[in-house]
Structures are given as C-alpha cells and as structure tokens.
C-alpha cells in the first residue's frame, strides 16, 4: 500500500510518500511537491532499496487512493504492477454527503461491491449500483456515485491479485501514528534533507518498537511489527534487534 502524508518543513508544506506492508514501513521519504516526477523520486527510494536486497524484486500489486500522480509514479517504477484503487477512499466523500436511511442504503451497496470476488461480479455490482442511483439519489451525491461506477477498470484489477489489499487503511494507521509524532514536535524546522532523515528514523522506530503489555497479554506470540512481518527476531531486546537488523551483517557499517 502507498500514500502520501502532508507535513511542513520550516513553513512550506511538503509530502511524505510512504510504502507499507505487513504492518511495517517499507519505504518513506520527503518530497517538495506531489506531482508525478517528485513522487517517482520519493517512491523510487523504496524501489532502489528493495532491489539492493533482491535485484529482481517486483511487487505484484499496490493499493493507492485516486491521486493520479501517485498511480503514475508506481506505474513508471514498476511497469507491470497491478494498480488497485482503494475502495474506501472512493466512498468516504459519498458517505459524508448522505444521512439517515439513505446513507445506510448507499453504504450497503458500496459494501456489496467491495465484497465481489471476481472481475465479472465486481463489474455487475458496479453496473447495478449505477442503475439504482438515478432513481434514489440526485445532485452532487448522484454524480459522485456515478463517477465511481465509471472507474470500473480501476476497481476490478483487485480480482487478479487475491492477496492484494482493497483498501489502504493499513497505511493510514501508520501515517496517523507518524503524524502524531510530527505534531508533538511541531513538525520539521530545518531542511527537507533533515526532515527525510527524521521520518525514516520514525519509521524504523515503529517497525521495531515492542508491543504494549495489553497486546502481549492477549496475544503472547506477538512481539513487534518486525516480528509479525518476518516471523522471528534477532534479539529479545528491541533496540539490539534494530541494530542487528540494520547492520546488514556488517556491510552497512
């Protein structure tokens, strides 16, 4: 999953292109703008680091919101990747404009679309949603629903990758944690380069931080995001585990 979070560096707003999987940050950087070229550079850091580890690395799919520059950046970095449009982002604005029973009906039909297991089923449910809309909705809400239904080609590819995420809320959870840290420090105060190092340090700390007592009590087998993703840890002390994992066997020292 991939998304960008806005933040500030000594006043001007910047974007933080972030790649997430398995509850861990896989890539994070800072770019001055959210256009295609800048995001290609930002997400390109993840691509370079992944290929340094596995030269033939190529993700099968990525789930993003509808921002064109994000999707185009990933298409340029990985030409054969399957781009999955986040269904949650597609309906949030619709949800905000509906109330009462009508809101329930709209969300029920959106849920049916999201649960489709094949391309054909997804296309059929989008078509039925589009047919239902003119007789039950009007104005801006109707146009928003029909606009989503017309993007059938962006939603159906998820059926080609059964393991692909259909929503990007997993990346939102990590970005929200990072945003709370940035807010507590009143954002960044020096340069884009130092801000990049700061968000990468935050990402590392998240990946290796030990879970709290309540989670460990309820799920004793879980230790940290790193352990969840890899199924092991190098050392029971989280800081030692971070230092060993990031040492690249001494090659990075």
Model-derived features with residue positions:
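Short, solvent-exposed secondary-structure capping/transition elements
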Residues: 25-28, 103, 214-215
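Intrinsically disordered, low-complexity regions enriched in Ser/Pro/Gly/Gln/His and often acidic
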Residues: 1-4, 104, 122-125, 199, ...
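RNase H-like nuclease fold core
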Residues: 1-61, 68, 72-73, 80
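Conserved structured core elements
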Residues: 37-40, 64, 168, 196, ...
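Alpha-helix boundary/capping detector
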Residues: 17, 88, 100, 200-204, ...
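Extended amphipathic alpha-helical interaction segments
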Residues: 48, 54-63, 70-195, 252
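Basic, amphipathic alpha-helical segments enriched in Lys/Arg and hydrophobic/aromatic residues
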Residues: 180-253
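Short, charged/polar low-complexity linear motifs in solvent-exposed/disordered segments
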Residues: 19, 26-27, 44-46, 112-113, ...
């Amino acid at each position: 999953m991939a998304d960008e979070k806005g933040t500030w560096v000594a006043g001007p707003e910047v974007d933080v292109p972030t790649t997430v999987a398995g509850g861990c940050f896989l890539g994070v950087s800072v770019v001055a703008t959210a256009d295609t070229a800048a995001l290609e550079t930002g997400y390109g850091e993840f691509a370079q680091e992944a290929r340094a580890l596995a030269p033939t690395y190529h993700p099968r799919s990525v789930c993003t919101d509808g921002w064109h520059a994000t999707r185009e950046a990933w298409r340029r970095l990985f030409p054969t990747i399957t781009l999955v449009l986040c269904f949650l982002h597609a309906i949030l604005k619709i949800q905000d404009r509906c109330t009462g029973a009508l809101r329930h009906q709209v969300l029920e039909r959106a849920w049916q679309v999201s649960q489709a297991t094949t391309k054909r089923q997804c296309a059929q449910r989008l078509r039925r949603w589009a047919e239902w809309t003119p007789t039950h909705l009007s104005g801006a809400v109707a146009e928003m629903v029909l606009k989503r239904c017309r993007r059938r080609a962006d939603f159906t590819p998820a059926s080609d990758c059964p393991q692909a995420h259909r929503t990007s809320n997993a990346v939102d959870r990590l970005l929200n944690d990072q945003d709370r840290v940035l807010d507590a420090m009143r954002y960044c105060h020096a340069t884009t380069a130092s801000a990049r190092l700061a968000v990468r340090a935050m990402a590392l700390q998240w990946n290796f931080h030990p879970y709290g007592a309540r989670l460990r009590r309820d799920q004793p087998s879980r230790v940290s995001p790193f352990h969840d993703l890899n199924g092991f840890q190098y050392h029971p002390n989280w800081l030692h585990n971070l230092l060993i994992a990031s040492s690249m066997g001494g090659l990075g020292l």
